[in-house]
């Protein structure tokens, strides 16, 4: 599937392989 960086997530599994689910402000986003 196509990788969407900085998409909302609940856990690392929701992100691409190279991304981690990190809290940014009040939301969690897939980030490096």
UniProtKB/Swiss-Prot annotation:
Predominant localisation class: secreted
Disulphides: 3-16, 9-21, 15-30
Recorded GO CC terms: extracellular region
Pfam family, one: Toxin_12
Keyword tRNA-binding in annotation: no
Protein's cellular compartments: Secreted
Tissue expression as described in the entry: Expressed by the venom gland.
Transit peptide in keyword set: no
InterPro entries attached to this UniProt entry: Huwentoxin-1 (IPR011696)
One function term, GO molecular function aspect: ion channel inhibitor activity
Keywords: Disulfide bond, Ion channel impairing toxin, Knottin, Neurotoxin, Secreted, Toxin, Voltage-gated sodium channel impairing toxin
Function, as annotated: Blocks voltage-gated sodium channels (Nav). Causes tail erection, scratching and a reduction in mobility at a dose level of 1.40 mg/mouse.
Entry text on domains: The presence of a 'disulfide through disulfide knot' structurally defines this protein as a knottin.
Family, per entry: Belongs to the neurotoxin 10 (Hwtx-1) family. 60 (Tx2-9) subfamily.
Name of protein: U5-ctenitoxin-Pn1a
Source organism (scientific name): Phoneutria nigriventer
